[in-house]
Each structure stands twice: as C-alpha cells, then as structure tokens.
C-alpha cells in the first residue's frame, strides 16, 4: 500500500486501448464486450475522444416503457453508439496520483477513465482493476 500512495496514473494504466467509433452498431459493441470483457470503450472520432460507452449504457438500450411496442432485437442492435454513449466523459491525465483517481472513481461511481495527455490524445485507460493490482505491491 505504501507505494500506491506515490504512484501516478502512468504507472498503472493500460496503454493499449481498444476504442470504438460513434458509428459502431450496438450489435458490434455487444460482440466487443463479449470478446474483451471490458466494461467501457472510449468513443473516438478523428483521433479525438468524443465519449465513452459502458456495458450499462448498452444495457439501457434494451429497456423500454411498458406501454410502448417492443422493438425487434435486430432493430435494437442496429442502433449506433452515438445514440447512447456518454458524451462528456470524465478523464484523467497520466500524471495524476492514483489516490486521486481512486477518490474520483468513488465520487463519480465510475470504474474506469480514459487517460489523455496534455494535447488531448488518448494514451491509455485506468480501471478499478488496475488500481487493485497496484494496492498489493
């Protein structure tokens, strides 16, 4: 735990990030969630972070009001990520302390954050699993 207090995001983040575009379909996203077992994907357009999409965001697309007609599964899977992503995601910098990221995760109830450098480029992602791995070191 002692080392954790002094660590920065860059020391714990996942550097190779899988991303999706705003045009990715819900069906493609479902397959990506299954294949990679990630909870979140950054949404990129023209090398810019435009949002994030989580498993929870995806599952919300399957919810409908009881008085409405039930949409066909195939139609739901054609929805684009842009229709249900979080457009103003929280993000952190590589130089932020892990203790601050942990505090942000608790305050925002988010389990991951994209990591952007000073130029706004996506350089990684930090998850609660990344933090847990570091606590024991």
Regions picked out by a protein language model, each given a short descriptive name:
Residues 1-137:
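Tandem CBS (Cystathionine beta-synthase) repeat/Bateman regulatory domains
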């Amino acid at each position: 735990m002692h080392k954790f207090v002094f660590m920065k995001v860059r020391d714990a983040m996942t550097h190779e990030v899988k991303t999706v575009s705003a045009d990715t379909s819900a069906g493609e996203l479902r397959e990506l969630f299954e294949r990679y077992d990630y909870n979140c994907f950054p949404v990129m357009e023209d090398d810019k972070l435009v949002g994030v999409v989580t498993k929870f965001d995806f599952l919300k697309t399957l919810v409908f009001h009881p008085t409405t007609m039930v949409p066909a599964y195939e139609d739901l899977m054609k929805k684009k990520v842009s229709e249900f992503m979080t457009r103003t995601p929280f993000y952190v910098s590589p130089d932020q302390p892990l203790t601050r990221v942990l505090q942000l995760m608790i305050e925002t109830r988010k389990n991951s954050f994209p990591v952007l450098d000073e130029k706004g480029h996506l350089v990684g992602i930090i998850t609660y699993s990344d933090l847990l791995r570091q606590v024991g070191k």
